[in-house]
Amino acid sequence: MDVIHPEIAKAKTLPSKYYTEESLYKSLLEKFSTTWNFVGHASMLEQSTTIPALIGNNPVMVTKDELGKFHCISNVCTHRGMVLTEGPTNQRTIKCPYHGRTFNLCGKLKHMPEFEQAENFPSASDDLPSKKIKNWHGLLFANLPVSYTHLTLPTTA
């Protein structure tokens, strides 16, 4: 693609297909879903305990637990697939608005109404899936694939 040019006067705009073609959009979302994505700044979690974000089309949330550790977990309830939060919150737990499942800030299921007597409950599959997260000078990056572990960060002067 001949769009980027070191001299701004010779640069071109992106072809319109980048804004209109559904197949290209889906292809780009897929590519972005397999790499590190910016999901927020650490300062966003000074007044909140959770902030929602998207990696591709995948709803995630960035949390900061009681010890100040950052986590990136799924923002979709493991029970019925409900999105858990639409905006920043400042709660010690994450509660599903559908059936009331409650998770801690690491994504571990803490409570499900009327399931106190259920056998073999909860199991690990009831917890919110965790994603990798890295903090680089306050910039928070996360990725979906568990197998993708290396984040190359620029060096600072």
Regions found by a protein language model. Name each.
Residues 1-3, 24:
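Rieske [2Fe-2S] iron-sulfur domain-containing proteins
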Residues 3-15:
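Short, contiguous pre-domain boundary segments
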Residues 14-55:
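Non-catalytic accessory segments flanking enzyme active sites
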Residues 38, 83, 157:
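Conserved beta-strand positions that form and line the central face of beta-propeller blades
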Residues 45-144:
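Rieske [2Fe-2S] iron-sulfur-binding domain
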Residues 146-148:
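Glycine-enriched catalytic-core subsegment of oxygenase/oxidase enzymes
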Residues 150-157:
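Single conserved hydrophobic/aromatic residue that forms the stacking wall/gate
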